[in-house]
Amino acid sequence: MKDSIRHLIQQALVRLTSEGVLPEGLTPAIQVENTKDKSHGDFASNIAMMLAKPAGMKPRELAEKLIAALPQDAQISKVEIAGPGFLNFFQNSDALAQRLETALADAQLAVHKASAKQRVVIDLSSPNLAKEMHVGHLRSTIIGDAVGRVLEFLGDEVIRQNHVGDWGTQFGMLLAYLEEKPAAAESELADLEQFYRAAKQRFDESPEFADRARELVVKLQAGDAQCLSLWTRFNDISLSHCQKIYDRLNVKLTPADVKGESAYNADLADIVEALREKGLLTEDNGAQCVFLDEFKNAEGNPLPVIVQKAGGGYLYATTDLAAMRYRSQQLHADRVLYFVDQRQALHFQMAFEVARRAGFVHEGMQLEHMGFGTMNGADGRPFKTRDGGTVKLIDLLDEAEQRAYTLVKGKNPELDEAELRQIARAVGISAVKYADLSKHRTSDYRFNFELMLSFEGNTAPYLLYAYTRVASVFRKLGKGIDEISGQIQLDAEQELALAAKLAQFGEVLNSVGEKGEPHLLCAYLYDLAGLFSSFYEHCPILGAEQEAQKQSRLRLAALTGRTLKQGLELLGLEPLERM
């Protein structure tokens, strides 16, 4: 609808320019926004205020001329001037009802991508396999997953890449411990964190063990068969731990999506050589660097991207450049989204620039760092255990499910144990995910079980319950959401408000896909649930006075239910038919 209004305004501008009211050569970015107060219409534009000065007119005077020049459109009932010169557009309720009918008849809810479809690589999760997944991995995993789901729904081809840390000096230490205690390894590897701590303790206390660890790193990097066998076994166990977490989080990551650091080992020397051939390398204290004039340190000197250490070893930047080249040349990506901590912003800005200069990525390929803030504890500091250690993700999910179980059992003591557990799992996991996804991606946030498990406010339990309310209407009716006949008619204020929000679903999803910000979808679903609650309270559905009105309201409820369910699923949450 916003695009339609922009087009109408553009036509009015062309007409006013041809009539000499506006000077030639104006190319304004026409802004159309949703209004918050529906007494001011459904959409507003500040175009008259933007162009008043070049037109040599007062904004309200230009606004009047724009309204007179606007073509007639069946979707718009009227246009008014507000305040200093805003144009307020009121939707035609019949045209709005027809748009909702189109959405109801479509499996995609009439949602289409506003721009051309693309092949998108999403770099997400990417834990270090030397340790167990902890809370720090949650944001990359679930934000990347939600954005990937939305892009797929919009029609993009999405390729997920789990760039796990499966290489590096720490693996020598782990392999030495695995070699030293093969019998105990199986049971100890069940707790990767404990295994890592035990290996680290041996490394710190025994010079002989430390020497053996360093020796094994060299052998591993040289491709020693026995070392590779031990390394593969360790990684397989670690990845199986990760996969259990992904399955539990309902995240669309599989073993086939793993493309770890080690996958690029054979390319690293070639990356350095390619940079040398392009004349981009400078030696600095024995290290091979690419200096970038656009990025300077506090003294005003260019910052380096180091791609090879003086001793010959490679760095994260080298691996990232190899991955960018692979994603361009082998995966033929149009767009690559990196869901990595905000603190890595400079690293990625510099790596992207080197990749472009070196020709590792094709012209027009979009490289975007989707940085995110930190999950903090109640004290506002990074979330830790009582003894200051990192919180294992599995422990967090266990506690969430147990708290949800206590909550659900208290509200529904009559439910059998199996259903209680199933509901508690969905509510607990959804609560953790939604508390994160509903915050702006770049914001830090405080983790709080009490708030996230509340049935009030912008929480997963509130939204899951909102969907069950819709489902209960159709259970009472004895019909499915997709079995309702009749036509939508919009009369009551609450019907119009709900309908206007339903019509915005596609626009919101396009914004999520473009910006990589799932909180926009969360805010939309929360508003939608609130508007449905008001509609449900003021507009009797099954008790409507006339049959046509009953069918219309059932159709509105059906579209609300389908939109809520689709939105929850795109966030990676599990809708429940009853709680």
Curated annotation (Swiss-Prot):
**What catalytic reaction does the record list?**
tRNA(Arg) + L-arginine + ATP = L-arginyl-tRNA(Arg) + AMP + diphosphate
- Compartments where found: Cytoplasm
PROSITE patterns recorded for this chain?
AA_TRNA_LIGASE_I
Per the record, the GO terms for biological process are:
arginyl-tRNA aminoacylation
Residues spanned by motif 'HIGH' region: 127-137
Q: Molecular function (GO) terms listed?
A: arginine-tRNA ligase activity; ATP binding
Enzyme Commission code: 6.1.1.19
Gene3D superfamilies according to UniProt: Arginyl tRNA synthetase N-terminal domain, HUPs, Isoleucyl-tRNA Synthetase, Domain 1
Q: Where is it mainly found?
A: cytoplasm
**Any coiled-coil regions, as ranges:** none
GO terms for CC?
A: cytoplasm
Q: What keywords were assigned to this record?
A: Aminoacyl-tRNA synthetase, ATP-binding, Cytoplasm, Ligase, Nucleotide-binding, Protein biosynthesis
Q: Which InterPro entries match?
A: aa-tRNA-synth_I_CS, Arg-tRNA-ligase, Arg-tRNA-synth_N, Arg-tRNA-synth_N_sf, ArgRS_core, DALR_anticod-bd, Rossmann-like_a/b/a_fold, tRNAsynth_Ia_anticodon-bd
**Family per similarity comment:** Belongs to the class-I aminoacyl-tRNA synthetase family.
| Assembly, per entry | Monomer.
State the name under which the record lists this protein: Arginine--tRNA ligase
The taxonomy runs: Bacteria, Pseudomonadati, Pseudomonadota, Gammaproteobacteria, Pseudomonadales
